[in-house]
Amino acid sequence: MIEYTDVNDLPDEIKVIDDFCIPEYNEFLNYKFVESGQIPFALSDSTTGGYEETPDREDKAHDFQGVHLVLRPPFVFSPAIYEFAPFFNVLPLTYKCKVNVNFRYGDTNLPYDAHEDLQEVDIPGGHYRSAIYYLNDNNGATEIRNPNGEVYFIKSNANRLVSFPGTWTHCGWSATDVKFRGAVNFIYFGEPKYDLMDQQYESQLNIADQGMMSLPNPKGA
């Protein structure tokens, strides 16, 4: 069983914001990307894609996931990019956005592969941040480890955003109380403007309303 860290006991480098979006927008994103079955996902045999680079690593049969890459310039721009526009206004200079869906694997919470999102050789000085937005409620977690070895466990609460230094080692933990654990991973540069999300009420609501109508058999239909 995971011992979640009280958000009041987190260091300043880790930022947690609950109720980050309006409920309708969160419900739409969760329905479309986790529940609807309408999104094409690439099946990755590692949550970090690191098997080829470290073939002698400890095998973890549960360490796989579905991935939908939304944004990674200059080559990847999914049509879904427009549905994440409110996030891009808050997280400046977003380098990467992808939706991860993990599958239930047994009745024990298990850690996925620990990693940093970018290699320092690619980003000298490591001046970037990672953020995770949880699409649904579940008893999984994100484990974050600072350079001093201190470990924090962030519970996967729907509509929660957690942001932290991208060079800090982190990993997800599997959920045992849902079939699918959905989260959106962002890598960005610059200072985030969290307050702007509250100012985008109409934008969030319009995306949610139009998006739900475009999906087959939306909730409540």
Region annotations inferred by a language model:
Residues 1-92, 204-207, 212-220:
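Non-heme Fe(II)/2-oxoglutarate
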